[in-house]
């Protein structure tokens, strides 16, 4: 087989409502997020399950579950850092699933479920993976769950410049277990009159209630990064909407 590349976009959630069920396939989050470029570019090979991120070996907790699919080594190139809130854990898990499908003919549905479960069981994410799988720019996760079980709706909006600044590496676990009923209120407010600015305004309110404050206008802080609308200064990472989800070529 010729060498393959797997392209997976980033995902930054602005509003989320965790949903835990007895069937892990339907566990996840209802929420709003931005699926963005620049994507990660992943070079998979058959071999001992290992993850190399920008040429550095990383200990990736999800690998405990992902390695049950197949023996895959991933070499990942990324323009954004790991552990700051860009949804990279979900993106890496998704890439591992797609690599298992491509290299070993593992059933795609099974691979996606294991990748989803690896995120849930390590407390690394609830909605990143399904958002990155389908893509769409601004997305609404209507139903929680793995790809094929959850449901994602792509919201059509007029795009403006978006950029981010990574500030600090932080754990996801506390973030996703913080359940706020205001999330559902803000999601409904957004759906009533959707726009990119409205997404930023409501995400700012929601994340501020969780203790994440951004000093910049038209922006919000999610975990260890700030995402900003319109004002993209030097030193910030520029983003475009990832209209397509993850793909292999």
Question: Which sequence ranges carry the predicted segments?
Answer:
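Short glycine-rich or small-residue beta-strand-to-loop segments that form or flank ligand, phosphate
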Residues: 77-85, 223-229
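ATP-binding N-lobe of GHMP and related small-molecule kinases
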Residues: 1-82, 235-249
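DPxDG-like acidic metal-binding loop motif
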Residues: 86-109
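Short hydrophobic-aromatic micro-motifs
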Residues: 5-8, 13-16, 131, 138-141, ...
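C-terminal nucleotide
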Residues: 102, 120, 146-249
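Solvent-exposed alpha-helices and their adjacent loops that cap or buttress functional pockets
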Residues: 6-7, 24-25, 33-36, 122-124, ...
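Alpha/beta catalytic cores of group-transfer enzymes, especially the acyltransferase/condensing modules
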Residues: 109-153
